[in-house]
Regions:
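Active-site histidine-anchored catalytic micro-motif
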Residues: 2-145
Length: 145
């Protein structure tokens, strides 16, 4: 199926891997932080004009800075994507990922997910969600819509 023939997504799985998009201040500077689903829902509720499909959320473990991405983590992502589609019935998957290695992960997943007939998108941000001027929410909700 070519990308131009995918119907609009109805049930999206959002997989959160960490990365800048969900980082928060820690004793050691910015670090991937859990609890991003609640922050995402809060932001969505504060923007009633945003129209997005139904979505579910899964926080990967461990959350990582994408500079620490590994082939083993790509396998975890593959398993999470396949589970979202085959077990949970999602018709698309959005992966929230750090920008340092996003392109490498996209390339790896393009091979690891051969034959999977749903769109898989990756997005990230240059600044954490909630930071003034951040591109996080526009990138996330632009990809989700």
């Amino acid at each position: 199926m070519s990308s131009s023939t995918y119907p609009a997504a109805q049930h999206v799985m959002v997989l959160y891997t960490g990365g800048t998009i969900g980082m928060q201040a820690s004793a050691n500077g910015l670090a991937p932080a859990s609890g991003f689903e609640a922050r995402m829902r809060d932001h969505l509720h504060s923007q009633p004009e945003l129209v997005v499909p139904q979505w579910r959320f899964r926080e990967m473990s461990p959350l990582i800075d994408s500079a620490n991405m590994t082939p083993a983590y790509w396998q975890q992502l593959r398993e999470a994507v396949v589970d979202a589609v085959d077990v949970q019935g999602c018709d698309s998957v959005l992966i929230l990922h750090g920008t340092d290695t996003l392109a490498y992960s996209a390339a790896a997943l393009s091979f690891l997910l051969l034959g999977l007939d749903v769109p898989v998108l990756l997005t990230g941000s240059m600044q954490p969600a909630g930071v003034p001027g951040s591109d996080a929410w526009p990138n996330l909700f632009g990809a989700l819509a």
